[in-house]
Amino acid sequence: MMTVATTEELYQRLLKSIREGVDLQPKMVNVGTVIQVGDGVAKISGLEQAMASELLEFPPKAGRSEPVFGIALNLEKDAVSAIILGDYLGIEEGDQVNSTGRVISAPVGQALIGRVVNALGQPIDGKGPIQTTKYRPIERIAPGVITRKSVDTPVQTGIIAIDAMIPIGRGQRELIIGDRQTGKTAVAIDTIINQKGKGMVCIYVAIGQKRAQVAQIINFLEKYGAMDYTIVVSATASESAALQYIAPYAGCAMGEEVMENGVIIDGQEVRDALIVYDDLSKHATAYRQVSLLLRRPPGREAYPGDVFYLHSRLLERAARLNEDYGGGSLTALPIIETQANDVSAYIPTNVISITDGQIYLETDLFNAGIRPALNVGISVSRVGGAAQTRAMRSVSDRLKIDMAQFRDLAAFAQFASDLDATTRAQIERGQRLQEVLKQPQFQPMPLEEQVVILFAGINGYLDDVPINQIGRFKSELVNYMRTAHPEVGKMIFENRLDRKFPSPEIRSAIEHMLKEFKQMSTFAEG
């Protein structure tokens, strides 16, 4: 027999609930129902108040102990289409979906330094949970013109060819573009390794890469001590297109936190961040997959119509802030993979038009042993020149033109049997400069050493050194400058040479080293 509670009993229960602090206020929850699901996309009815890019929750149920989240991307007349972040196989027709009233956010701040996380900011390195209470929306409007400052501080990549001819400044967006296996990632990783002790937090975002390749990159960063100031965001090829799509935005949010609020590295506050997107070609492919699954109309090469906005809203968030807003910076190095050296394809031309210059790496140069395989004619930096130190600017002013002319003359010389003395001398000097600019991976070179070596090459000091001895002469000159004239390197590094460059010490050191080098038997044999 069913018992019915009396009015007095109900009243006593209500009083008890009030004493225990139970919230009896009614809550409005926007709830929907899955009407169709497949390939990582769910179609949901009943979410009339859903916002664009809102985070949706698929609550736990039998067989699923944790909630699954999605992002509302298509707001249609009778339904909402959402991409599912995570395992969508457990989601079925008829499942409940809750609105959260917020957009997707990523954890940010000090606790992420040295960690490897997925696109949602969850740790995947086996080092335990990330202890942070700071979160930022992954999507955000880029800083306005009033908050920005012109680029005037260099990012030293440690790669002599780039620092001299295509300089990068803090707050710049510099594209690294080329075919597969031309050294694009190597340039980015060398740049990260070279930031040790330079007050820069680095973020490496792997999009659509193989897991083995990402693990190898992490091992290199740990080996060279770069993980002490680096965050790795990984959305590998084995993960869903939805996670690959949001990964660069999550990494950018982490970089913006450094730029605006700073972190502590080696006891010093750091407000400069460098972010590498490796690569945005695979990011565009992931977004194309998501868009086609959402039934959005395809355009050129089957990409959706807003694929330009996909990358422009990401890369515009790189900035140099003025002193009123903290003076921090976020420098972006996006990577694009071309097919058969075609830089005029859809995605490459989009990103070239967004960025402040590009570093173009060429397959033929790479196969010829010229590494980094930099094509000087196509590569350019639109703003980084203002960030070069005086000493580097003084030695590199002519270098790019000389190298571009050398490549043209070298191509012409293949078909010409008789060359005049001036042309021959120009080609021979260009060959020596080409050797000077060669550099092995994982061996970034300090600024002061770059300046001395370039000065020797540009001013003809190496004209009598055999080409196969240039590498050895470089290393011996650097060692001599370190031991005999350390004060010169310090002056170059601190940008104190002013108009005295080149100092007499640099000239005398090069001449002394050249004289000693000529006396060696190996020189004569060369």
From Swiss-Prot:
Record's keyword terms, sorted: ATP synthesis, ATP-binding, Cell membrane, CF(1), Hydrogen ion transport, Ion transport, Membrane, Nucleotide-binding, Translocase, Transport
GO cellular component, one term: plasma membrane
Enzyme Commission number, as recorded: 7.1.2.2
Xref: InterPro entries: ATP_synth_asu-like_sf (IPR023366), ATP_synth_asu_C (IPR000793), ATP_synth_asu_C_sf (IPR038376), ATP_synth_F1_a_nt-bd_dom (IPR033732), ATP_synth_F1_asu (IPR005294), ATPase_a/bsu_AS (IPR020003), ATPase_F1/V1/A1_a/bsu_N (IPR004100), ATPase_F1/V1/A1_a/bsu_N_sf (IPR036121)
Keyword ATP-binding: yes
GO molecular function terms listed in the Swiss-Prot or TrEMBL record: ADP binding; ATP binding; proton-transporting ATP synthase activity, rotational mechanism
Record: residues binding ATP: G178, D179, R180, Q181, T182, G183, K184, T185
CDD domains membership: ATP-synt_F1_alpha_C, ATP-synt_F1_alpha_N, F1-ATPase_alpha_CD
Pfam family, one: ATP-synt_ab
Mode of membrane association: Peripheral membrane protein
Marked site (Required for activity) residue numbers: S379
Catalytic reactions on record: ATP + H2O + 4 H(+)(in) = ADP + phosphate + 5 H(+)(out)
Compartments (UniProt record): Cell membrane
Superkingdom of the source species: Bacteria
Family from the record: Belongs to the ATPase alpha/beta chains family.
HAMAP family: ATP_synth_alpha_bact
Function text: Produces ATP from ADP in the presence of a proton gradient across the membrane. The alpha chain is a regulatory subunit.
Subunit details: F-type ATPases have 2 components, CF(1) - the catalytic core - and CF(0) - the membrane proton channel. CF(1) has five subunits: alpha(3), beta(3), gamma(1), delta(1), epsilon(1). CF(0) has four main subunits: a(1), b(1), b'(1) and c(9-12).
Name used for this protein in its record: ATP synthase subunit alpha
Gene designation: atpA
